[in-house]
UniProtKB/Swiss-Prot annotation:
It comes from Escherichia coli (strain K12). Transmembrane segments: none annotated. InterPro entries: 2Fe-2S_ferredoxin-like_sf, 2Fe-2S_ferredoxin-type, 2Fe2S_fd_BS, Beta-grasp_dom_sf. This is Uncharacterized ferredoxin-like protein YfaE. GO terms for cellular component: cytoplasm. Residues 2-84 form the 2Fe-2S ferredoxin-type domain. The gene is yfaE. GO terms for molecular function: 2 iron, 2 sulfur cluster binding; electron transfer activity; metal ion binding.
Amino acid sequence: MARVTLRITGTQLLCQDEHPSLLAALESHNVAVEYQCREGYCGSCRTRLVAGQVDWIAEPLAFIQPGEILPCCCRAKGDIEIEM
């Protein structure tokens, strides 16, 4: 179980092992995340990873800068902080 901190609000959420992605974990806590494809193609869910690391479920096809993640195709690897 990983703790996700949302930097803008300071809210802390727990990611359960049954969440298939970080996006699913955020949605389970009623965090509104913009998305379209849910598979790493469009980049709509792009956000900045402030602290920690993620495991990629699938290699994102959308262009991301260093320090950015796509919550739809990754999972938290331990505690993380994201720019939301």
